[in-house]
Every structure is written in structure tokens, then in C-alpha cells.
């Protein structure tokens, strides 16, 4: 490449950043602006041949849908990075139900207002010197949840929906209290880790007088920029395609799966139209998993490792045929395969929408790798979603249990956003 060409490309990039920054401030037309000006920078610059490339660019350049129901961060394309933070009311605030209620209202009001600003602006527009300065919106999204323990603190147990009952103990649990529970939950996602970090810092600081962090975990998945097909189901750290069985977001089953039904009890109506999030910290025993050959791994899961297809099938999205047998009459999908025991057919139709991430904390002091799955499952009621599926996996001998450890667990109610009201206001002030 000649020197004049290099200069022109550098100039073009600077011009693009300036122009796209202006488009980001206006909000409108950002997707078009990103696609048009970034095409010359792509390895394959033929726009007709690379619609996937344009989609990659949009994830970095666009803003999240602030009107997504019940809150942003549940539907739509999943960003590459997420930070889940569980918080408790400060000790001083828990002295009595009145102070707890006032502090909860202050925290939820602050997060609602700040989340709205973050969806419209950027962290560096809100706080001078933020780490995200100079970066695009990166699909930043914020979700706010409420734990059952908060209702106890504000003396509102009578307003606790059955769906927010404590999760039962499962026979395979190896839970650590420091990674469980929480009065509140913040899920913050973005396509760029610096944008994510800057937003998390502002959100935690906004309620620092009323709350304290209980636990947090950062997760990641493949970026849109690196994906050959941004719509493809991502893989986890075990190399599995993970999330194939999710209901399609454009299918009526999706809303039926994630949305809380209208309550029979008016005291529980604050969660009408909301959703329930189960979070599990699942450490993978990757050293043991690596000892298995590909065929053994596929028998554990019940799917092909390369394509994600159910054993005996050809395509990832082919239905799981539990009755299929080989020439010798043996089940093509083993009786203890993960996909068999987790299937709706094996669990009275139980379904959830999984939107999980990988996590990697490096190596512990004892030399053990601390990496695995930040499991997140959305449903209208855990009793017809996560609970029966997890009970089946735990009690019926899921072959995957040998290679994973459930070390953290929490359940949060995620109320629907309502015009002119802060998140959870119907609970706190209702």
C-alpha cells in the first residue's frame, strides 16, 4: 500500500468517527450512518455480500431499545459483555421497615432515572472523565431487578408473588453464600467493556448511600465484530453451541415464556407484565472436560459439537427426537444426556429463555480454574420454567453434572417499566 493511500484511509477514519459521533448525538439514523461510513473499513467492503458485517457494526454504533418490554436487556441482540451486580440495602437502612422502604425507593428512583439517561446518552456525557470517553454507544442496556429479601426488609411479605418464593435446594447444589441472593440486581450489558465499566461505576455510585454490593460477576460471549454470523447461537467455554432450544423472539411463545401473567391477588399486581430472572454461577471443570474426546462430549450433551445438531440429526435447529434409536435399538440420545433431561417433553412443557454468558476469573490460589457459565434464565414463573428443569437435571443423573458445579444462585423479580413511574414503585408505594 502506498503512502498516499494510507493517509487517505487515516483521514477517512477520522472523518467517520467525527461524523458518527454527531449521528450518535441525534440518535436518529445511527444504524444507517454506521453501515454507510464503515463499509470501506471492512475486510469485504461489498455491502451486498456482507449484511452480517453491517450488523456487527450496528452493535457497536447503535443504542439499545429503551422501550423494550418489560425492560431493556431481555430481548433483542445480546451484547458481548455483561456485568451482573447484586446489592443489599445498607445496614443503616435496614433498621426498620420505614427506613428500608425509603432507602429502597431512593435507590430504585436513582437507577430508573440514570438508566433512562444511559439509554439516551453515554456514561461520558453524564460524568466528566468517564472511561468511555471517545467511544460509541455500544448497545448499552440496563436492567433492574428486586430480590425477595427486599420485601422482607420493607415488611411487604404479603406482596410477594408465589413466583418470587425462594428457589428450592437441588441435590447437585454446592452453593457459596457470598455468591447468592441480593435485595436488588443490576444487569448492565454493552458491546464494549469500557462502556460497560463506565456505566456500572455510575449506577453503583448513584445508590451508594442506600445500598452496598453483595456480589458481582462479569460475563462475556463472542463479539458481533468477530462473529461470522452475528445471529448464530454462541458457544460456551466447553465449546458447545448454547441456547439452541430458546423460543424465537419473533414467535408468540417468547412472550408467553418470559412474561409474568396478571396476578389473581391484587397485592401481587406490581409484577404484572414483568419477568423473573434466575441467575446461577456454574463453574465448569474444564480440565476434566478436556480429557474427553469429541464423541464422549457429544454423548454427555446429546448434540453434535460442531453443528449443535441433536444426535441423529443434521442441523442445529432440528427437533430433538427422544425416541430415535440406532440399528441396535439403543437411544441415539443417551438416557442421561443433558438435552434429553432438559427438554420440555421431559418436564411437562417447562420452558425458559436462557441468555447466558461465560465468565473467567483465572486461577484460584489452589490452582483450580475459576471459569464457567453465568447462567441467566428468564421466565414468567420459575415454577414452570427453571425449577422443574433443574430438578430433572439434578435428580435424574444428568451426565453433565460430573463436569460442572453450581456455586451461586439468585432469583429476582424484574418489574415492567411504567410511564412516569420509577421501577418497582407499585411495590414500594402501592
From Swiss-Prot:
Leader sequence segment: 1-39
Cofactor note: Binds 1 heme b (iron(II)-protoporphyrin IX) group non-covalently.
Cofactor: heme b
Catalytic activities: Reactive Blue 5 + 2 H2O2 = 2,2'-disulfonyl azobenzene + 3-[(4-amino-6-chloro-1,3,5-triazin-2-yl)amino]benzenesulfonate + phthalate + 2 H2O + 2 H(+)
InterPro entries: Dimeric_a/b-barrel (IPR011008), Dyp_perox_C (IPR048328), Dyp_perox_N (IPR048327), Dyp_peroxidase (IPR006314), TAT_signal (IPR006311)
Residues binding heme, per UniProt: 338
GO MF term (any one): peroxidase activity
Post-translational changes noted in the entry: Exported by the Tat system. The position of the signal peptide cleavage has not been experimentally proven.
Activity-pH dependence: Optimum pH is 3.5 with Reactive Blue 19 as substrate.
GO cellular component: cytosol; extracellular region
Disordered: region residues: 42-75
Record-annotated active site: 242
Keywords of this entry: Heme, Iron, Metal-binding, Oxidoreductase, Peroxidase, Secreted, Signal
EC number(s) recorded for this UniProt protein: 1.11.1.19
EC top class, as a word: oxidoreductase
Biased composition (Low complexity): 60-69
Places the protein is found: Secreted
Highest rank taxon of the organism: Bacteria
Activity as a function of temperature: Optimum temperature is about 25 degrees Celsius. Thermostable. Retains 50% of its activity after heating 2 hours at 60 degrees Celsius, while no decrease in activity is observed within the same time at 30 or 40 degrees Celsius.
Family, per entry: Belongs to the DyP-type peroxidase family.
Subunit structure of this chain's protein: Monomer.
Stated name of the protein: Dye-decolorizing peroxidase Tfu_3078
Species assigned in the record: Thermobifida fusca (strain YX)
Amino acid at each position: 500500500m502506498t503512502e498516499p493511500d494510507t493517509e487517505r484511509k487515516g483521514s477517512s477514519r477520522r472523518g467517520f468517527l467525527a461524523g458518527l459521533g454527531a449521528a450518535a448525538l441525534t440518535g436518529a439514523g445511527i444504524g444507517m450512518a454506521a453501515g454507510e461510513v464503515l463499509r470501506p473499513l471492512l475486510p469485504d467492503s461489498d455491502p451486498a455480500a456482507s449484511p452480517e458485517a453491517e450488523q456487527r457494526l450496528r452493535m457497536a454504533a447503535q443504542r439499545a431499545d429503551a422501550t423494550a418490554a418489560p425492560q431493556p436487556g431481555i430481548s433483542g441482540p445480546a451484547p458481548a459483555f455483561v456485568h451482573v451486580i447484586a446489592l443489599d440495602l445498607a445496614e443503616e437502612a435496614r433498621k426498620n421497615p420505614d427506613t428500608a422502604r425509603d432507602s429502597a425507593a431512593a435507590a430504585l428512583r436513582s437507577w430508573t432515572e440514570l438508566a433512562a439517561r444511559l439509554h439516551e446518552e453515554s456514561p461520558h456525557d453524564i460524568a466528566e472523565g468517564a472511561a468511555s470517553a471517545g467511544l460509541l454507544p455500544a448497545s448499552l442496556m440496563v436492567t433492574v431487578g428486586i430480590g425477595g429479601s427486599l420485601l422482607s426488609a420493607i415488611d411487604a411479605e404479603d406482596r410477594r408473588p408465589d413466583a418470587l418464593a425462594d428457589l428450592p435446594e437441588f441435590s447437585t447444589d454446592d452453593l457459596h453464600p457470598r455468591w447468592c441472593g441480593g435485595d436488588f440486581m443490576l444487569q448492565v450489558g454493552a458491546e464494549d467493556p469500557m462502556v460497560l465499566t463506565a456505566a456500572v461505576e455510575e449506577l453503583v455510585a448513584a445508590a451508594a448511600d442506600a445500598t452496598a454490593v453483595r456480589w458481582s460477576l462479569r460475563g462475556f460471549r463472542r463479539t458481533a465484530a468477530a462473529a461470522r454470523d452475528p445471529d448464530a447461537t454462541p458457544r460456551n467455554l466447553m465449546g458447545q453451541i448454547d441456547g439452541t432450544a430458546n423460543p424465537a423472539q419473533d414467535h408468540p411463545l417468547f412472550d408467553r415464556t418470559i412474561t409474568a401473567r396478571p396476578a389473581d391477588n391484587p397485592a401481587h399486581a406490581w409484577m404484572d407484565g414483568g419477568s423473573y430472572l434466575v441467575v446461577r454461577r456454574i463453574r465448569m471443570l474444564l480440565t476434566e472436560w478436556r480429557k474427553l474426546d469429541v464423541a464422549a462430549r457429544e454423548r454427555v450433551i446429546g448434540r453434535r459439537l460442531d453443528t449443535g445438531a441433536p444426535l441423529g440429526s443434521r442441523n442445529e435447529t432440528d427437533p430433538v427426537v427422544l425416541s430415535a434409536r440406532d440399528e441396535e435399538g439403543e437411544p441415539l440420545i443417551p438416557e442421561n444426556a443433558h438435552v434429553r433431561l432438559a427438554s420440555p417433553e421431559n418436564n411437562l412443557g417447562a420452558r425458559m429463555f436462557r441468555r447466558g454468558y461465560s465468565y473467567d476469573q483465572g486461577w484460584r490460589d489452589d490452582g483450580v480454574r475459576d471459569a464457567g457459565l453465568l447462567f441467566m434464565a428468564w421466565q414468567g414463573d420459575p415454577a414452570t420454567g427453571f425449577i422443574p428443569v433443574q430438578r430433572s437435571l439434578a435428580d435424574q443423573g444428568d451426565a453433565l453434572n460430573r463436569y460442572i458445579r453450581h456455586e451461586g444462585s439468585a432469583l429476582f423479580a424484574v418489574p415492567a417499566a411504567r410511564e412516569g413511574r420509577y421501577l418497582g414503585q407499585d411495590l414500594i408505594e402501592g
